[in-house]
């Protein structure tokens, strides 16, 4: 069953990665995904999870991955799966309730802002234009950096391949001993250059989050005079907007990382082919090296092509989200699933809090405990 696999994965990720500081966002994504995908079958799936079979499988999994289960891992195992199950139960129970609360919140906001509808629409429009002006240079800079660092990677790797060709010409009678160190170094160079590429490009997502916070705060200040007695409700909607916009920034970072890792994977087979030909004749190896050069050019160009639109696509997504807020605060009633972003935000906040508690308890060398574990699950706060 899908949910069983997800929670097994959740436990494995947390346990095997606990010492490597696994990201709470990674765990929250797993929980949110199974909440989203299971839909109407969630209740039955959660009940199935609580059967003894799950405990047996998790015990076997922990033993397989960790050998002797230490106290920390054992406590984590006992806390994580119930926590994930409880979160899912809360999500399932509170989804419709929150949906109604958001509907009422928007109704009150629209009623309060209605006398100033034109001014509110104008302020949001101004904010959209400021957002476009802020983000435009980032899209251009990202594209420039992609081209610059991809070209640097291509030149660096091509230079190494050319050195291998030169060594081949000079050591035809002793290929394996002469070229094996170069082949090993080439693979290491690919890994280093890919990591450097990611290191140069992924910080853009964090910079964009800062711009998002600035833009949303300016929007809040510009709308505050029109929402004096419903400021808390406006703030809540703007928090939801910022959350959605930052999700786009995280997705941009994930796409950059995924494309860089895919480039690494596409280069690996040709490098392995060269290594495999070290035992063969010089002609076969020379052909493999020639293929390596052309393969490098082709794969780096494909990487640049794939990355090219990401900045502009990100900008359009953010502008669209601000425009959707303008529609929700106007006559448009809003989408049927507006509440889901708030539900997901609350989920991620709770997972972050849970992991903070785990870390604090571990640092204090105290038994792990889920806050309010003995109390009945309460509703997600909106």
Curated annotation (Swiss-Prot):
Subunit-level organization: Homodimer.
Species assigned in the record: Acinonyx jubatus (Cheetah)
Region (13 X 22 AA approximate tandem repeats), start-end ranges: 33-330
Any single biological process term in GO: lipoprotein metabolic process
Keyword annotations from UniProtKB, A to Z: Chylomicron, HDL, Lipid transport, Repeat, Secreted, Signal, Transport
Main location: secreted
Free-text domain note: Nine of the thirteen 22-amino acid tandem repeats (each 22-mer is actually a tandem array of two, A and B, related 11-mers) occurring in this sequence are predicted to be highly alpha-helical, and many of these helices are amphipathic. They may therefore serve as lipid-binding domains with lecithin:cholesterol acyltransferase (LCAT) activating abilities.
Spans annotated as Disordered: 362-382
Subcellular location: Secreted
Name of the protein in question: Apolipoprotein A-IV
UniProt signal peptide: 1-20
Function: May have a role in chylomicrons and VLDL secretion and catabolism. Required for efficient activation of lipoprotein lipase by ApoC-II; potent activator of LCAT. Apoa-IV is a major component of HDL and chylomicrons.
GO cellular component: chylomicron; extracellular vesicle; high-density lipoprotein particle; low-density lipoprotein particle; very-low-density lipoprotein particle
Pfam families for the chain: Apolipoprotein
Family designation: Belongs to the apolipoprotein A1/A4/E family.
InterPro entries according to UniProt: ApoA_E (IPR000074), Apolipoprotein_A1/A4/E (IPR050163)
Domain of life of the native organism: Eukaryota
Gene3D superfamilies: Apolipoprotein
Entry keyword annotation includes Ribonucleoprotein: no
Ranges occupied by Sequence repeats: 33-54, 60-81, 82-103, 115-136, 137-158, 159-180, 181-202, 203-224, 225-246, 247-268, 269-286, 287-308, 309-330
Keyword Cytoplasm: no
Spans through the membrane: none
GO molecular function, one term: phosphatidylcholine-sterol O-acyltransferase activator activity
